[in-house]
Curated annotation (Swiss-Prot):
Listed result of changing S849A: Loss of phosphorylation and proteolytic processing
Protein name in the entry: Transcriptional activator GLI3
Signal peptide: none
Organism: Homo sapiens (Human)
Crosslink feature (Glycyl lysine isopeptide (Lys-Gly) (interchain with G-Cter in ubiquitin)) location: K773, K779, K784, K800
Length: 1580
């Protein structure tokens, strides 16, 4: 094969040479190729090396046969590996793609890249008569000379394969050479895999290594050598592409799929690379040959039936081709070649195919939108031949080296424009924008400059002033003499000079950053920072410290950003996608995209030469810079200010206003983020986008792709475009702030997504331009509404208004709603949707209208950006990291792992803490949000979370129905909702989710101890038994329960409390989730939590936690209604139901406390939480409800904050309202506890004074109004306790409800609280005393827990003393822990933390709590770990210790307890009740919380109790799948948060801090906790 390929290469080369000789046009191309080659050689090592480096470039033929030989060998090796890797990488699952290694190389070469491949493929090409004529016209085709074309064709065929593997259009493209047999990839020895990889890698490398490679890619199809075939074959090929473009429906579908898979970017990259490889070798025949060989392989593969492929999915082929061309570099490369070498062929091709022509026209109309997008597309268009050079260059820009662009273009008059318009031309080859590519500038430092310009245009644009300089570093300068004012030192090397300048002049200047270089055009204008001066000095010294690390690439840049941009040529990354509706063109830098958009999609030339007397205007800043530098001299560089004036790209009107703006800001593109910084621009951008939509009604989506793809670089409009187009654009989400779309765009998933998805989007848009436009308009309207945020969301999410409402309504708690990021409130008070909101909505929107570009883009990115829907994977991760929120976990899960860009962007998003919005949301949250959005808008449900399948139904439901707003019955509350997507709402419900409240419902609290199944079964008997036996009746007892249940869960009636079976709220997703959860529980699927990713678990927990923590104080008091409360709780057993109840209770009981709880929002670290806790304790009733589940319920505020995540919007908020009224606070609180206390409640009810049945005990205890008050606090505490049992106490269920620590504990606590007035002091002092004291004295971290817990406990204790001991005695830690939680609030709230609780108990508990981290779980195991005076106390202590350890609330509570005047228990309780909020605020608590989270994870079921505690920490984990790590991370974030708000509900604070955990050692703590939890589970 290699021999063949070599000979092929040789022949090809000869042909190429001949062609060059034959055609002047070819000669032109040849020159370009030479220039390219030169550039490549200059910038990079010899082409061969370069190729070698990019083994994938095998497709390209080396310049020499030897080179080819080498290439084939090396590429074979590397390429195979890389191909495989890439396939795997991009193709997370592309079964159909065959092994690339041997087939790839072998096929490529075996199939005489030209001949073997050509014939078989060309016959199929004949399918496209339009294309075929060119093939016949050029015999080379059949001769095998038209190797390049075949390469492109195979990809087309591959496209079909792509259909099979939409995710990897490129891969299918090549790998699936037998596109029909995706699996036949290997079947085709032409090695579809390698072709895929090769083209992709080659493309990437070619981009990086040398524009020439890009060109080579282009050359592949249009290499000068193959000018004849190139002309014919490429023309034919392009014709086909154009044709296909017209019919790109199939491929569009595939592409969207690919985009959805997150491989859109890669696909586009690959396609571009393929194109590039095939058609972008105007510079080096050898390289093109290689690429051709590679491409030929697939195409030449006999198995690859082009005809069939075309017939099967002509659109797919077109799309692939287009996408290929779309790639900035491929496009440019091809365009460049196309112009020069294929001019005639292209003309012929176009004319030859009527369909082609039609497509042509379509493309033209889409213009470079599509064609331009695919550098060679314009060539496809008849006009393309006219401006072949120019066009290729536009395509080249990204791929082409500066030299290539400048040299090649410089060769031909058009080339020059091409260089400048390398991107521009790509965009608008027809415009024949002769961007005066000052070959001199570009050529002088082609690598640094040309590349910079194009790939680095973004970078250059970013640092306009300096970048300008950088870009303007025209010649390769190598200064060795210092020309600083007053210094004339001479050095032997540039390095010495640089060292001298940096040390003697720059550093010596201290804070005066002025360039005093003689004749410096800056005229000693000071820089803002020293680094800017340092970088600037490189213009004078010629230093280029940033060298390309790719093998064979010798490019070096003075600016790191330029290097990064250049590296995209090697990686093939093209994050900047044309924002135009039908244009799938992607670029490696925003500058190129801006050029393309301004040139192709707009006649606007926003960049005006400011030099007096000069009237020149340009579409992009790089062209303007070149003009100024070339025409007016290096001294007349354009300043940033000028650019600003110039780039007022206020082209909102501009068709690609958004793009143009985004690009035009081209300079901003560089800083699209930087310059987009114009927040005003962001705003205006949106308007512009809308305007642009109007202007380009045809391509409203065009803008959209840009937001994601170009958004970061481009810009302001792009994000706006996103907004307007998608109604919500991913980039916005990324940005974290609507205003700073630029920043958002930088991180936006859409960027990458757009790369991937944009192609699909564009294809889709093209396919259905009218429909897409219409959809776009609809989306725009929607977006406008959404931008109104609340107005829009509410309307959009009426069905699941609760979910959305909380997002919106959580203005205060909105952050909590986002649970992952307090600041993340999706629809908080912001006038616009937060970036996350936008992203979420956008994703949902996209789902709704996949046809629309945005939709398509999202289809691409939808999966890849599960977590940060708006971010590509990379961006999403950035957002996630930045957020430090549970969302992190979901980033990987939600987003398509395969989507490279998506991954990269998602990581960026995760890193940028500034994006609290959707990005901050955990995958589950985002999924919920999306699901809600979809439900509201009637769009398709969001893509299920990655791990959803393995989640039990209940878990899935929990995720889906995160908030499970009663009104919001997301159709796919279970699967449809993405775990990561589940917006804030799901979280409230999330409480329940812990899973899923079904089996887990009872065990929630004990879940950590008990693993899912165990927890389900075991807790079910004790807890569930209590819940089922007692709780159902209790639940049924009150409509309040029902209201609670309805709101948050399906157990509106007592009967449904834990069972959820009879959910009075069938419509709400929550109910569905509850039912599902119950089913799962019944099926012992509680393990779901165990199986659920840590992120998901955390998310669920955080939802629950919010409720618990916030409601704990009042939850206990609410427990006063435990009798019916437990039932209610049972109903709320599900997070939503619970949350709803909690909300109500919170509102009713202690608004102050409630609010306090709210501050405990997941992300909130403010001590306000602690204060709220205090309030909560004071107003036990309001938090008393299931703080675990509904922040809002227990503490109107607290609940909401957490609920947004858990119960969030629907569950949390609505329940708050409903539950509040129905339950009158305490009872409602109890209901809230019901998720944990449902069982608990039953236990309490049934076993009023039963030590094991602490919950029942509590319930049984007499409840008085005061008790109710206490119950409120106790209820909240109970909720917390529920959460706690979930943690370490799960095993240590002290109450009779070991089954559902959360619910049991909650119910118990509620019961206690109910009895608190009467016997709350007793029980509280005993149980709570133990638990509380244990926590309080135990450790500072546990204090919080202790306080909250102790408070609940104390109330409970004081109320049902026997219960407390019973709880302690009870072996089920989860319950005990839950009780503790309940107690603390109870005690603090109700009996005023009955001082009855012995100091010893408190102290013991405190002591125990001190080691709660470990003791927590251990405590669960050994209920009496800390020989407490009271068995119950001990248990409670253990339980609470566990709980608080995890919550890290004990220590603070302890401290607080110390402050209390009552016995330690009493004091602690009081402190807890009084300082519940304080506890929330303490960091120790949160730290403990971290552990708590871990524990809760262990006890997946416990999560209900732990919701508040664990939700925060575990929230991310839920999605992540790795419990310990995610939790640790989340907890770490929690830690920070924990510190602040943990008192009232350590868990809510934890939830908040989960994402922003400040405690770095939390991971170890969490790990140990997880281990402990496991141990406890085992013990249990």
């Amino acid at each position: 094969m290699e021999a063949q390929s070599h000979s092929s290469t040789t022949t090809e080369k000869k042909k190429v040479e001949n062609s060059i000789v034959k055609c002047s046009t070819r000669t032109d191309v040849s020159e370009k190729a030479v220039a390219s080659s030169t550039t490549s050689n200059e910038d990079e090592s010899p082409g061969q090396t370069y190729h070698r480096e990019r083994r994938n470039a095998i497709t390209m033929q080396p310049q020499n046969v030897q080179g080819l030989s080498k290439v084939s060998e090396e590429p074979s090796t590397s390429s195979d590996e890389r191909a495989s890797l890439i396939k795997k990488e991009i193709h997370g699952s592309l079964p159909h793609v065959a092994e690339p290694s041997v087939p790839y190389r072998g096929t490529v070469f075996a199939m005489d890249p030209r001949n073997g491949y050509m014939e078989p493929h060309y016959h199929p090409p004949h399918l496209f008569p339009a294309f075929h004529p060119p093939v016949p016209i050029d015999a080379r085709h059949h001769e095998g000379r038209y190797h390049y074309d075949p390469s492109p064709i195979p990809p087309l065929h591959m496209t079909s394969a792509l259909s099979s593997s939409p995710t990897y259009p490129d891969l299918p493209f090549i790998r699936i050479s037998p596109h029909r047999n995706p699996t036949a990839a290997s079947e085709s020895p032409f090695s579809p895999p390698h072709p895929y990889i090769n083209p992709y890698m080659d493309y990437i490398r070619s981009l990086h290594s040398s524009p020439s490679l890009s060109m080579i890619s282009a050359t592949r199809g249009l290499s000068p050598t193959d000018a004849p075939h190139a002309g014919v074959s490429p023309a034919e090929y392009y014709h086909q592409m154009a044709l296909l473009t017209g019919q790109r429906s199939p491929y569009a579908d595939i592409i969207p799929s690919a985009a959805t898979a997150g491989t859109g970017a890669i696909h586009m990259e690959y396609l571009h690379a393929m194109d590039s490889t095939r058609f972008s070798s105007p510079r080096l025949s050898a390289r093109p040959s290689r690429k051709r060989t590679l491409s030929i392989s697939p195409l030449s593969d006999h198995s690859f039936d082009l005809q069939t492929m075309i017939r099967t999915s002509p659109n797919s082929l077109v799309t692939i081709l287009n996408n290929s061309r779309s790639s900035s570099s491929a496009s440019g490369s091809y365009g460049h070649l196309s112009a020069s070498a294929i001019s005639p062929a292209l003309s012929f091709t176009y004319s030859s195919a009527p369909v082609s022509l039609h497509m042509h026209q379509q493309i033209l109309s889409r213009q470079q939108s599509l064609g331009s997008a695919f550098g060679h597309s314009p060539p496809l268009i008849h006009p393309a031949p006219t401006f072949p050079t120019q066009r290729p260059i536009p395509g080249i820009p990204t791929v082409l080296n500066p030299v290539q662009v400048s040299s090649g273009p410089s060769e031909s008059s058009q080339n020059k424009p091409t260089s400048e318009s390398a991107v521009s031309s790509t965009g608008d080859p027809m415009h024949n924008k002769r961007s005066k590519i000052k070959p001199d500038e570009d050529l002088p430092s082609p690598g640094a400059r040309g590349q910079q310009e194009q790939p680095e245009g973004t970078t250059l644009v970013k640092e306009e002033g300096d970048k300008d300089e950088s870009k303007q570093e025209p010649e390769v300068i190598y200064e060795t003499n210092c020309h600083w004012e007053g210094c004339a030192r001479e050095f032997d090397t540039q390095e010495q000079l640089v060292h001298h300048i940096n040390n003697d002049h720059i550093h010596g200047e201290k804070k005066e950053f002025v360039c005093r270089w003689l004749d410096c055009s800056r005229e000693q204008k000071p820089f803002k920072a020293q680094y800017m001066l340092v970088v600037h000095m490189r213009r004078h010294t010629g230093e280029k410290p940033h060298k390309c690390t790719f093998e064979g690439c010798t490019k070096a840049y003075s600016r790191l950003e330029n290097l990064k941009t250049h590296l995209r040529s090697h990686t093939g990354e093209k994050p900047y996608v044309c924002e135009h509706e039908g244009c799938n063109k992607a670029f490696s830098n925003a500058s190129d995209r801006a050029k393309h958009q301004n040139r192709t999609h707009s006649n606007e030339k926003p960049y005006v030469c400011k030099i007096p007397g000069c009237t020149k205007r340009y579409t992009d800043p790089s062209s303007l810079r070149k003009h100024v530098k070339t025409v007016h001299g290096p001294e007349a560089h354009v300043t940033k200010k000028q650019r600003g004036d110039i780039h007022p790209r206020p082209p909102p009107p501009r068709d690609s206003g958004s793009h143009s703006q985004s690009r035009s800001p081209g300079r901003p593109t560089q800083g699209a983020l930087g310059e987009q910084q114009d927040l005003s621009n962001t705003t205006s951008k949106r308007e512009e986008c809308l305007q642009v939509k109007t202007v380009k009604a045809e391509k409203p989506m065009t803008s959209q792709p840009s937001p994601g793809g170009q958004s970061s670089c481009s810009s302001q409009q792009s994000p706006i475009s996103n907004y307007s187009n998608s109604g919500l654009e991913l980039p916005l989400t990324d940005g974290g702030s609507i205003g700073d779309l630029s920043a958002i765009d930088e991180t936006p998933i859409m960027d990458s997504t757009i790369s991937t998805a944009t192609t699909a989007l564009a294809l889709q848009a093209r396919r259905n331009p009218a429909g897409t436009k219409w959809m776009e308009h609809v989306k725009l309207e929607r977006l406008k509404q959404v931008n109104g945020m609340f107005p829009r969301l509410n309307p959009i999410l009426p069905p699941k208004a609760p979910a959305v409402s909380p997002l919106i309504g959580n203005g205060t708690q909105s952050n909590n709603t986002c649970s992952l990021g307090g600041p993340m409130t999706l629809l908080p008070g912001r006038s616009d949707l937060s970036g996350v909101d936008v992203t979420m909505l956008n994703m949902l929107n996209r789902r709704d209208s996949s046809a629309s570009t945005i939709s398509s883009a999202y289809l691409s990115s939808r999966r890849s950006s599960g977590i940060s829907p708006c971010f590509s994977s990379r961006r999403s991760s950035e957002a996630s990291q930045a957020e430090g929120r549970p969302q992190n976990v979901s980033v990987a899960d939600s987003y398509d792992p395969i989507s490279t860009d998506a991954s990269r962007r998602s990581s960026e998003a995760s890193q940028s803490d500034g994006l609290p919005s959707l990005l901050s949301l955990t995958p589950a949250q985002q999924y919920r949000l999306k699901a809600k959005y979809a439900a509201a808008t009637g769009g398709p449900p969001p893509t299920p979370l990655p791990n959803m399948e393995r989640m039990s139904l209940k878990t899935r439901l929990a995720l889906l129905g995160d908030a499970l707003e009663p009104g919001v019955a997301l159709p796919p509350v279970h699967a449809p909702r993405r775990c990561s997507d589940g917006g804030a709402h799901g979280y409230g419900r999330r409480h329940l989710q812990p899973h899923d409240a079904p089996g887990h419902g009872v065990r929630r609290a004990s879940d950590p101890v008990r693993t899912g199944s165990e927890g389900l079964a075991l807790p079910r008997v004790p807890r569930f038994s209590s819940l089922s036996s007692c709780n159902p009746p209790a639940m049924a007892t009150s409509a309040e329960k029902r209201s609670l249940v309805l709101q948050n869960y399906t157990r509106p009636e007592g009967g449904q409390s834990r069972n959820f079976h009879s959910s009075p709220c069938p419509p709400s997703i929550t109910e569905n989730v509850t039912l599902e959860s119950l089913t799962m529980d019944a099926d012992a699927n509680l393990n779901d939590e165990d199986f659920l990713p840590d992120d998901v678990v955390q998310y669920l927990n955080s939802q629950n936690q919010a409720g618990y923590e916030q409601h704990f104080p009042s939850a206990l008091p609410d427990d006063s209604k435990v009798p019916h409360g437990p039932g209610d709780f049972d109903a709320p057993g599900l997070p939503d139901s619970h949350a709803g109840q909690q909300f109500h209770a919170l509102e009713q009981p202690c608004p102050e406390g409630s609010k306090t709880d709210l501050p405990i929002q997941w992300n909130e670290v403010s001590s306000g939480s602690a204060d709220l806790s205090s309030s909560k304790l004071k107003c036990g009733p309001r938090p008393a409800v299931p703080q675990t589940r509904a922040f809002g319920f227990c503490n109107g505020m607290v609940v909401h904050p957490q609920n947004p995540l858990r119960s969030g919007p629907a569950g949390g908020y609505q329940t708050l309202g409903e539950n509040s009224n129905p339950y009158g606070g305490p009872e409602h609180l109890m209901l809230h506890n019901s998720p944990g206390s449902g069982t608990s409640g039953n236990a309490f009810h049934e076993q009023p004074c039963k030590a094991p049945q602490y919950g029942n005990c509590l319930n049984r205890q007499p409840v008085a109004p005061g008790a109710l008050d206490g119950a409120c606090g106790a209820g909240i505490q109970a909720s917390k306790l529920k959460s706690t049992p979930m943690q370490g106490s799960g095993g240590q269920l002290n109450f009779g409800l070991p089954v559902a620590p959360n619910e049991s504990a909650g119910s118990m606590v509620n019961g206690m609280q109910n009895q608190d007035p009467v016997g709350q002091g007793y029980l509280a002092h005993q149980l709570l005393g133990d638990s509380m004291q244990h926590p309080g004295a135990g450790r500072p971290g546990q204090q919080m827990l202790g306080q909250i817990s102790a408070t609940s406990h104390i109330n409970i204790y004081q109320g049902p003393e026997s219960c407390l001991p019973g709880a302690h005695g009870m072996g089920s830690q989860p319950s005990s822990l839950a009780v503790v939680r309940g107690y603390q609030p109870c005690a603090s709230f109700g009996g005023s933390r009955r001082q009855a609780m012995p100091r010893d108990s408190l102290a013991l508990q405190s002591g125990q709590l001190s080691d709660t981290s470990q003791t927590c779980r251990v405590n669960g195991i050994k209920m009496e770990m800390k020989g407490q005076p009271h068995p119950l106390c001990s248990n409670l202590q253990n339980y609470s210790g566990q709980f608080y350890d995890q919550t890290v609330g004990f220590s603070q509570q302890d401290t607080k307890a110390g402050s209390f005047s009552i016995s330690d228990a009493s004091c602690l309780l009081q402190g807890t009740s009084a300082k519940n909020s304080e506890l929330l605020s303490p960091g120790a608590n949160q730290v403990t919380s971290t552990v708590d989270s871990l524990d809760s994870h262990d006890l997946e079921g416990v999560q209900i109790d732990f919701d508040a505690i664990i939700d925060d920490g575990d929230h991310s984990s839920l999605m992540s799948g790795a419990l310990s790590p995610s939790i640790i991370q989340n907890l770490s974030h929690s830690s920070s948060r924990l510190t602040t708000p943990r008192a009232s509900l350590p868990f809510p604070a934890l939830s908040m801090s989960t994402t922003n955990m400040a405690i770095g050692d939390m991971s170890s703590l969490l790990t140990s906790l997880a281990e402990e939890s496991k141990f406890l589970a085992v013990m249990q």
